[in-house]
Amino acid sequence: MQSFAKITAQGTYVPEKVMDNNDFEKIVETSDEWIQQRTGIIERRIADENEYTSDLSYKAVLDLQEKYQVDLTDVDMIINTTLTPDYKTPSVASYVQAQLGLKNAGAIDINAACAGFTYGLNLANGLITSGQNKKILVIGSETLSKITDYNDRSTCILFGDGAGAFLVEYDKEEMSFIASNAGSDGLKGHNLYCTELSEEMFSDDLENHGYIVQNGRGVYKWAVGNVPNIIHEVLNQSNYSIEDLNWFVPHSANARMIESICEKANIETDKALKSLKYYGNTSSATIPLSIDLAIKEGKIKKDDLILLVGFGGGLAYASTLIRWTI
């Protein structure tokens, strides 16, 4: 018997505290106009001092449960994608498992930075279609504010906190996942990093220990040069073309970057769904937050063909072409 994986519910959570562009004028030399022109960001959400990634993950799942009235007692795997876990161990996924009371569910964290959520979805699809699991929560959650240097103008204006969750289930007939790909360019990892135990990479010294460091130009050049090829590669696996897409959901890193990717890939810019305007760059949470905003705006409908492409730190990428089944 063939097994299909189907997305059946989605939820999100963002912290209450809002930090808008005007707030940054008091911290670093910048302005609302400068930030909007270069990034497309107006505001972002910031977690409280005692609010951590696991809290955001759990609240996103509660939102999913409340909106769709789904039974989560038989969830058998939790995949949490994050680069800002509460602890080195145990995992954020284990915390969510405990909070939900799912005694026998597997739990794993994935650190693929901004590509994390699409990696998580692809893993969930593989686990379900192989017959190993039946019901999986995939969560992308970040508290990037806790690893942001607010003296560094080039990065502090970009990042925010948030979480999004999808429920992926076994189905006999209907499937969400059509095609996918993934890869990385580790030699360019120095363009976006946050140090932990080591302070060097390929014998090069790294800076600003414990905070995000980004070579914006390097990341931009890599993304615009590679993401269009990634898009065409995953579409070539399917029977669909660029014109067939209802929506394109890239990682919401920067509005200019997304426009350049769309132009090079021949995707209409109004098909690109983004979350950065109100949430900033939330790394692994940007894609589920973008989906949620589009649903609330009445854009996404059942059976829409949607291409999700995550890319960023690593430099890593993962994409998945889905049919919206909610």
From Swiss-Prot:
GO BP annotations listed: fatty acid biosynthetic process; secondary metabolite biosynthetic process
Subunit relationships: Homodimer.
Family under the similarity heading: Belongs to the thiolase-like superfamily. FabH family.
Known role: Catalyzes the condensation reaction of fatty acid synthesis by the addition to an acyl acceptor of two carbons from malonyl-ACP. Catalyzes the first condensation reaction which initiates fatty acid synthesis and may therefore play a role in governing the total rate of fatty acid production. Possesses both acetoacetyl-ACP synthase and acetyl transacylase activities. Its substrate specificity determines the biosynthesis of branched-chain and/or straight-chain of fatty acids.
EC number, as in UniProt: 2.3.1.180
Keywords: Acyltransferase, Cytoplasm, Fatty acid biosynthesis, Fatty acid metabolism, Lipid biosynthesis, Lipid metabolism, Multifunctional enzyme, Plasmid, Transferase
Pathway(s) this gene product operates in, as recorded in its UniProt entry: Lipid metabolism; fatty acid biosynthesis
Active site per database record: C114, H251, N281
Catalytic activity: malonyl-[ACP] + acetyl-CoA + H(+) = 3-oxobutanoyl-[ACP] + CO2 + CoA
Pfam families, per the entry: ACP_syn_III, ACP_syn_III_C
Annotated GO MF terms: 3-oxoacyl-[acyl-carrier-protein] synthase activity; beta-ketoacyl-acyl-carrier-protein synthase III activity
Primary location recorded for the protein, binned into one broad class: cytoplasm
Protein name stated in the entry: Beta-ketoacyl-[acyl-carrier-protein] synthase III 2
